[in-house]
Structures are given as structure tokens and as C-alpha cells.
Amino acid sequence: MSAVTQAVAALRMRAPYENWRPPVIGVSLLVPVGADCLAVADLRGMLMLPGGGAYERQRPEDAAHRVLSGPPGGLRLLRRVAVDWVQTRRRKVITHVLATAPMTREAVGHLIYRDPRATVRVLPTVRVIDGLPTQGRLRVLVGLQALATGETAYIEGGVVLPSAPPNLTQEWWGQRRGGGGRAGWAAAG
């Protein structure tokens, strides 16, 4: 191996193995139904918050309207209640948790989920929390608390942060520049 090849290999071994690719950005919807229930997607027994990916330069709020469609008058989004991200080997996976206005059971009956294999169900909040995987459970608990307090919560790698991290960039808010990539599955759960 030549000296140049060895030098390049040594640099690659020391370089951080992260953010080689643009982040995957997704949305999860927190849909309150009445005072004690949530609407969830049920994919053959696996419960999850309704979610989907955001396309290049698409705002999370716009992506949310592709996740659930069909309610009379459209889906009324209140605000972003949480931003959850994890650093994988090559990119960040960022999920925006958006809360909708409270819905009635009748209105939820008109919702159509983007994945035809899943059905939208209304379940008691406690049952939803028990039935979700760990990451989804954290998003629901923190999202509900943030909705109640009027704050936005920040979750990094499964840890709730006390405040917004100083390095938030526009790409985190769905305003990515350059670099392609299709929508990801960041929002599942």
C-alpha cells in the first residue's frame, strides 16, 4: 500500500462516521379524542402514532396532511409539541411530533391513514402508552406534557433535553437545502 493510500485510510478511520447523508425527516401525529383517548394507527396488531416521511424541502406541517386525510374541514393541526432525533451511523433521523385539535369519535371515523394496511383506531390513552414501543411511548408522554404546558419538547437519542439545543438548524424544521433523498420512516412509533 502506498504512503498516500495509507494516509487517506488513516484519515477515514479517524473521521466521524456521521452525517454523510442528508437527514431523514418525518412526522408523527398526536391526535387527542375527547379527554382520555388518542387516535392511533393499528398495523395488524402493532400500534403506532400515525406517521410518515417529509419530502425534500417539505415543511412537517405539510407532510402531516399526507399522513391522515378525510376529516370534514381537513386536519386541524395545533402545533409542534416535540422534536425527536437520533444520530445513526450516516445521518440524523428527525421526527416532528405535531398535535392536532381534539377530535370526536365521529370525526376520527372519517380519517384515512396513508398506509391502507393499517386502520385508525381510538383507544384510551393508557392503553396506547402500554401498547407502543419505547420510542413511541416517550413521544406520546412528552408530547402530551408539552401540549398541556404550551412548550415544545426536545428529545435526543431517547433523552429529554431541558431546552432547545443551540445547534438547531433549518434542516431540522423541514427546510433542508441541497442533497436529495426520499421520505423516510422516521415517524413510525
Identify the residue ranges that each predicted region occupies.
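Residue-level detector of functional hotspots within protein domains
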Residues: M13-Y17, P23, V40, D84, ...
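Nudix hydrolase/Nudix homology domain
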Residues: L47, Y113-G189
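Short hydrophobic alpha-helical segments used for membrane anchoring or interfacial signaling
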Residues: L30-P32
